[in-house]
């Protein structure tokens, strides 16, 4: 989207949303979809969303009186062999007087519509904010400074400065989290924007108290970042991230079981309770810097004291006995069982090593569909689905009770 310097006064409409791209979108856009990314129901047939705050996405370019609109339900489907399969609904935000329900007054009752307004908004007025042209602009990430939707809904947290190459960076794309190699915009963020991101991230973290989820791309990044900042992602062996276990030198913690299971081993979670935080390591350690041919080596010496009256004292002692210089060993209760000896009885029909003859399974014929149109999506549904980001659940790894401190990610 080319940008140019203004030469005097102009009758062109003012920009609506300050999004950090070369030129923000203008009022009266010819698009037909929401400016914002969707919130998505976690289950089929979820009730309509309720919000902790006003329910209006943050937009610093609008006056308080203009902060009102509606959330509209969007039914979603996936193509499958047997036809089309419904998936949980998505809900999109539109300002009053725009979008599919542009002819409604604020508060008019209609199925699949939830009206929202900020305190002090003039709901009798209609907005001239227009809608988005998806061929020109990406979706704008959702931010709720006063509280987001209830726990029946989710949305993906996207940094405001993340954009897509080859298209306008006026709006950060929800799809960018599926491609971490895409370059983010290099514009500076204001302190207020950083604070807003922190608040939004906290809201999402609060909604996901039952357990965080990490994508495969994020896990790969965790395992290959700078060595001193690495963490062991789910499904990884310790040696994949920090190298083979040793004895008597650095890397001497972990027996064979811990190395194989990584953070699944409960002993990891236990011992991480004793590991110093970054600040403790920096300010409470004995730090010894040493210049070497390959660079500056920093040695941190820190002592954690576990009182003898600690309820877990014996467990910590046991874990240290097992895992310090533990390479080549396993816990006693995890020793592999010896294989049972082969039977010396003569082979009979019952115990013969020859495989039994299997019955041939009948091939299932695909069911005929009375309505062939039902097998494919309609053109409207194809267009709607094309607008949706993160339709499918991303390939994620259940993190469970995190073995990492909140400052480690």
Curated annotation (Swiss-Prot):
<feature type="domain" description="CoV N NTD">
    <location>
        <begin position="31"/>
        <end position="156"/>
    </location>
</feature>
<comment type="subunit">
    <text>Homooligomer. Both monomeric and oligomeric forms interact with RNA. Interacts with protein M. Interacts with NSP3; this interaction serves to tether the genome to the newly translated replicase-transcriptase complex at a very early stage of infection.</text>
</comment>
<feature type="modified residue" description="Phosphoserine; by host">
    <location>
        <position position="379"/>
    </location>
</feature>
<feature type="compositionally biased region" description="Basic residues">
    <location>
        <begin position="70"/>
        <end position="83"/>
    </location>
</feature>
<keyword id="KW-0597">Phosphoprotein</keyword>
<feature type="compositionally biased region" description="Polar residues">
    <location>
        <begin position="341"/>
        <end position="355"/>
    </location>
</feature>
<keyword id="KW-1040">Host Golgi apparatus</keyword>
<keyword id="KW-0805">Transcription regulation</keyword>
<comment type="function">
    <text>Packages the positive strand viral genome RNA into a helical ribonucleocapsid (RNP) and plays a fundamental role during virion assembly through its interactions with the viral genome and membrane protein M. Plays an important role in enhancing the efficiency of subgenomic viral RNA transcription as well as viral replication.</text>
</comment>
<feature type="region of interest" description="Disordered">
    <location>
        <begin position="121"/>
        <end position="149"/>
    </location>
</feature>
<feature type="region of interest" description="Dimerization">
    <location>
        <begin position="226"/>
        <end position="333"/>
    </location>
</feature>
<feature type="region of interest" description="RNA-binding">
    <location>
        <begin position="29"/>
        <end position="160"/>
    </location>
</feature>
<feature type="compositionally biased region" description="Low complexity">
    <location>
        <begin position="164"/>
        <end position="179"/>
    </location>
</feature>
<feature type="region of interest" description="Disordered">
    <location>
        <begin position="327"/>
        <end position="409"/>
    </location>
</feature>
<feature type="compositionally biased region" description="Basic and acidic residues">
    <location>
        <begin position="368"/>
        <end position="384"/>
    </location>
</feature>
<keyword id="KW-0687">Ribonucleoprotein</keyword>
<feature type="compositionally biased region" description="Low complexity">
    <location>
        <begin position="15"/>
        <end position="31"/>
    </location>
</feature>
<keyword id="KW-0543">Viral nucleoprotein</keyword>
<keyword id="KW-1015">Disulfide bond</keyword>
<dbReference type="Pfam" id="PF00937">
    <property type="entry name" value="CoV_nucleocap"/>
</dbReference>
<dbReference type="GO" id="GO:1990904">
    <property type="term" value="C:ribonucleoprotein complex"/>
</dbReference>
<feature type="region of interest" description="Disordered">
    <location>
        <begin position="1"/>
        <end position="31"/>
    </location>
</feature>
<dbReference type="GO" id="GO:0044177">
    <property type="term" value="C:host cell Golgi apparatus"/>
</dbReference>
<feature type="compositionally biased region" description="Basic and acidic residues">
    <location>
        <begin position="180"/>
        <end position="192"/>
    </location>
</feature>
<dbReference type="GO" id="GO:0044172">
    <property type="term" value="C:host cell endoplasmic reticulum-Golgi intermediate compartment"/>
</dbReference>
<feature type="region of interest" description="Disordered">
    <location>
        <begin position="164"/>
        <end position="193"/>
    </location>
</feature>
<protein>
    <recommendedName>
        <fullName>Nucleoprotein</fullName>
    </recommendedName>
</protein>
<feature type="modified residue" description="Phosphoserine; by host">
    <location>
        <position position="190"/>
    </location>
</feature>
<keyword id="KW-0694">RNA-binding</keyword>
<feature type="modified residue" description="Phosphothreonine; by host">
    <location>
        <position position="378"/>
    </location>
</feature>
<feature type="domain" description="CoV N CTD">
    <location>
        <begin position="215"/>
        <end position="331"/>
    </location>
</feature>
<dbReference type="GO" id="GO:0003723">
    <property type="term" value="F:RNA binding"/>
</dbReference>
<dbReference type="InterPro" id="IPR042547">
    <property type="entry name" value="NCAP_gCoV"/>
</dbReference>
<keyword id="KW-0946">Virion</keyword>
<feature type="disulfide bond">
    <location>
        <begin position="320"/>
        <end position="323"/>
    </location>
</feature>
<feature type="region of interest" description="Disordered">
    <location>
        <begin position="46"/>
        <end position="83"/>
    </location>
</feature>
<dbReference type="InterPro" id="IPR044345">
    <property type="entry name" value="N_prot_N_CoV"/>
</dbReference>
<comment type="similarity">
    <text>Belongs to the gammacoronavirus nucleocapsid protein family.</text>
</comment>
<keyword id="KW-0804">Transcription</keyword>
<dbReference type="InterPro" id="IPR037195">
    <property type="entry name" value="Nucleocapsid_N"/>
</dbReference>
<dbReference type="InterPro" id="IPR001218">
    <property type="entry name" value="Nucleocap_CoV"/>
</dbReference>
<dbReference type="InterPro" id="IPR037179">
    <property type="entry name" value="Nucleocapsid_C"/>
</dbReference>
């Amino acid at each position: 989207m080319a940008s140019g310097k203004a030469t005097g006064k102009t009758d062109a409409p003012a920009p609506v949303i300050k999004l950090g791209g070369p030129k923000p979108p203008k009022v009266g856009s010819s698009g037909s979809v929401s400016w914002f990314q969707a919130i998505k129901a976690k289950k089929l047939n979820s009730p309509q969303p309720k919000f902790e705050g006003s329910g209006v996405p943050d937009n610093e370019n609008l006056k308080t009186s203009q902060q009102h609109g509606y959330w509209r339900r969007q039914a979603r489907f996936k193509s499958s062999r047997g036809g089309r399969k419904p998936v949980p609904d998505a809900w999109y935000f539109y300002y009053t007087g725009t979008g599919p329900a542009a002819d409604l007054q604020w508060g008019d009752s209609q199925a699949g519509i939830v009206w929202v307004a900020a305190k002090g908004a003039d709901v009798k007025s209609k907005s001239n904010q227009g809608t988005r042209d998806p061929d020109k602009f990406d979706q704008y990430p959702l931010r709720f400074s006063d509280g987001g939707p209830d726990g029946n809904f989710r949305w993906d947290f996207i940094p405001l400065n993340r954009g897509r190459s080859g298209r306008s960076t006026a709006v950060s794309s929800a799809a960018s989290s599926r491609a971490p190699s895409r370059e983010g915009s290099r514009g500076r963020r204001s302190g207020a924007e950083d604070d807003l991101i922190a608040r939004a991230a906290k809201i999402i973290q609060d909604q996901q108290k039952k357990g965080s989820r990490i994508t495969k791309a994020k896990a790969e990044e965790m395992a290959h970042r700078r060595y001193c900042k690495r963490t062991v992602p789910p499904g990884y062996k310790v040696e994949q991230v920090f190298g083979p276990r040793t004895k008597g030198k650095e890397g001497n913690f972990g027996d064979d079981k811990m190395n194989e299971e990584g953070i699944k081993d409960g002993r990891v979670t236990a011992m991480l309770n004793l590991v110093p935080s970054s600040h403790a390591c920096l300010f409470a350690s004995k730090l010894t810097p040493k210049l070497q041919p390959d660079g500056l080596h920093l040695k941190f010496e820190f002592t954690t004291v576990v009182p003898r009256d600690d309820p877990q004292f014996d467990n910590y002692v046991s874990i240290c006995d097992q895992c310090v210089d533990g390479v080549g060993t396993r816990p006693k209760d995890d020793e592999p069982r010896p294989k049972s000896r082969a039977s010396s009885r003569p082979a009979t029909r019952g115990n013969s090593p020859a495989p039994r003859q299997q019955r041939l399974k009948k091939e299932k014929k695909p069911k005929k569909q009375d309505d062939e149109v039902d097998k494919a999506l309609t053109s409207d549904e194809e267009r709607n689905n094309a607008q949706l980001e993160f339709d499918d659940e991303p390939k994620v790894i259940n993190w469970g009770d995190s073995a990492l401190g909140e400052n480690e990610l």
